[in-house]
Design a protein with these regions (language model features):
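Extracellular glycan-binding segments that recognize GlcNAc-based cell-wall polysaccharides
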Residues: 1-117
C-alpha cells in the first residue's frame, strides 16, 4: 500500500485471504494497477487489482505491481475473490461478497480468482 493510504480515503478492513508467492498448477497472477490523472501532473488517482499484466491499458504501480497468485479454479480452502466497480466514481474494489457488499452503485465485474483462507 502507498504510504499515504489514509489520505486517499482507504481504510483497513482486515484480510480477505491470502495469495501464493509461488506458482502452482492452475495459478492465476494478480497485479496491482493504477489510473493516473493527466490533468493533475499524472498523479495516481485510483488503484485496482487485475489479472492482466498490462493493467487493462492502465499502469503498473511503481513499488512492485505483482501481488501474487490466486487459484483459477476453486479448490478446498479457497473462496472466490470478486472485483466490483462503481461507474460514477471509477472505483474498483475486491471483495468476497458476490453482491459487492450490498453497495447499490457497485456492479460485479468478475471473479479475479480464488484466494486461500
Amino acid at each position: 500500500m502507498p504510504q499515504n493510504w489514509g489520505k486517499l480515503g482507504w481504510r483497513n478492513e482486515g484480510s480477505l485471504g491470502f495469495v501464493s508467492t509461488t506458482y502452482f498448477e492452475n495459478a492465476r497472477p494478480m497485479y496491482i494497477c493504477a489510473m493516473y490523472d493527466p490533468s493533475w501532473n499524472n498523479h495516481i488517482v485510483k488503484y485496482f487489482s487485475s489479472n492482466d499484466p498490462g493493467c487493462e491499458g492502465y499502469h503498473p504501480i511503481e513499488w512492485g505491481y505483482f501481488e501474487g497468485y490466486l487459484s483459477s479454479t476453486q479448490v478446498p480452502g479457497t473462496v472466490p475473490l470478486y472485483r466490483c466497480y462503481i461507474e460514477a466514481t471509477k472505483d474498483h474494489f475486491d471483495t468476497r461478497s458476490s453482491d459487492c457488499e450490498g453497495e447499490p452503485a457497485a456492479k460485479l465485474e468478475f471473479v479475479l480468482g480464488y484466494i486461500f483462507l
